[in-house]
A protein has these predicted regions:
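Oligomerization/assembly interface segments of phage tail-like spikes and tubes
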Residues: 112, 197-202
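Acidic/His- and Gly-rich active-site-bordering loop/insert found
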Residues: 1-118
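Acidic-enriched catalytic cores of C-N bond-cleaving enzymes acting on peptides and small amides
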Residues: 210-222
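Glycine/serine-rich anion-binding loops at beta->alpha junctions
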Residues: 117-131, 209
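Histidine-centered active-site/metal-ligand motif
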Residues: 95, 209-210
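Acidic/histidine-rich catalytic neighborhood of metal-dependent amide-processing enzymes
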Residues: 126-198
Length: 222
């Protein structure tokens, strides 16, 4: 059984609550990435913000382009804990962006701790996973453990609308022997997913007056 000190638990909790306070919806992930970079820089062998070129929006696998969108202040974050050269490399991936609050959720970015559970926008998807990786990095440093292979940590933008942040890292040529993607899964290991295909569908009908529908063609029926 792995025992975690109260100091480490408190550090992880504080990081999670601070991340929840940062409203990192699409296009506004920069402050969260910079905050996390500052926290991880002294704990890793390399930690840097990776700028995303706006040219990524021309990639055939890019999802949901928005006219006028820019990545000027939405970098990915990459951190590395170097291995001892005796094992395989692993990339850990999770995301910093969150779904915008629903109507009426006035305090979505105000974290609440209740009976050992932290509530707030992104606590489950996926800032809790960010905190989990932070805990892993803290424990490696505390116990002076050098992993067999390099551990690379990607904290990406724009997962919620198709995975554009991860796409940008892949296009940089990032490679490893294995990848672990952290998402809410009820503690189940999911070795594969069905994926997704985005497409636009146009169906044409023929309009008609409600008093004379004999010649109309319903696009919905087609």
């Amino acid at each position: 059984m792995l025992l975690i000190s109260s100091e480490t638990k408190n550090a992880v909790r504080d990081l999670l609550m601070e991340l929840i306070r940062i409203p990192s919806v699409r296009g506004h992930e920069g402050p969260a990435a910079r905050y996390l970079c500052d926290r991880l820089l002294p704990l890793t062998d390399r930690c840097e913000l990776i700028a995303i070129d706006d040219a990524i929006m021309q990639d055939p696998d890019y999802a949901f382009p928005i006219p006028g969108h820019s990545y000027r202040d939405t970098p990915n974050l990459e951190c590395v804990v170097g291995g001892n050269g005796r094992g395989r490399s692993v990339v850990f991936n999770t995301h910093l962006d969150v779904v915008p609050p629903s109507e009426g959720q006035a305090h979505a970015f105000d974290p609440i701790e209740e009976s050992g559970t932290i509530w707030g926008r992104g606590a489950c998807d996926a800032k809790g996973q960010v905190a989990t990786l932070y805990a892993l990095i803290l424990l490696l440093r505390e116990r002076r453990v050098r992993p067999p292979g390099d551990l690379t940590f990607h904290f990406v933008v724009e997962e919620e609308n198709g995975g554009n942040g991860t796409l940008a890292m892949i296009r940089r040529g990032v490679r490893a022997d294995a990848a672990v993607v952290l998402e809410p899964s009820e503690m189940c290991i999911i070795p594969a997913v069905r994926g997704a295909v985005w497409f636009d569908l146009k169906v044409f009908g023929r309009a008609a007056h409600s008093g004379n529908v004999a010649g109309r063609i319903s696009a919905l029926d087609k």
